[in-house]
Amino acid sequence: FMRSAATVHVKQNGSIRDFYVKEALSYIEQNFQNDISIEDISASCGLNRSYFGKIFHDTIGRSPQEFLISYRMTKAAELLKITSLSIADIGNAVGYPNQLHFSRAFKNVYGISPRNWRNENKIE
């Protein structure tokens, strides 16, 4: 009964969904540099993965995985622009301990390698 009452409330005004999504965004912001999974994020909200994925996508417009990758790559781009940290160190700092995986993910998002992106965007 409690879950169905909550579901009715969500359909009426969305405030419970907003709460869960804000909790998830806060968790991502605080933990993106760690090896976190969508299960970890959904568990931090007290939800199962499939329900969490649906409300997150309905609210944000993309899957939790897409959002996490985008968030990490935005942070990586900031670090590439303003620091002289190595590509490996930046990958590590944004949750990619494997430099090859980081470089591939970065290139998927930006269409260019982290090294080339840095060369084109570095603040001197």
PLM ranges: what are they?
Residues F19-Y27, L68, T74-E78:
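Pre-recognition alpha-helix immediately N-terminal to the DNA-recognition helix
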Residues S4-H9, Q33, H57-D58:
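Sigma70-family region 2
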Residues F1-A5, I28, F56, L80:
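Hydrophobic recognition helices of helix-based DNA-binding modules
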Residues Y27-E29, D35-Y71, L85, G91-N116:
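Basic/polar phosphate-binding segments, predominantly the helix-turn-helix DNA-binding elements
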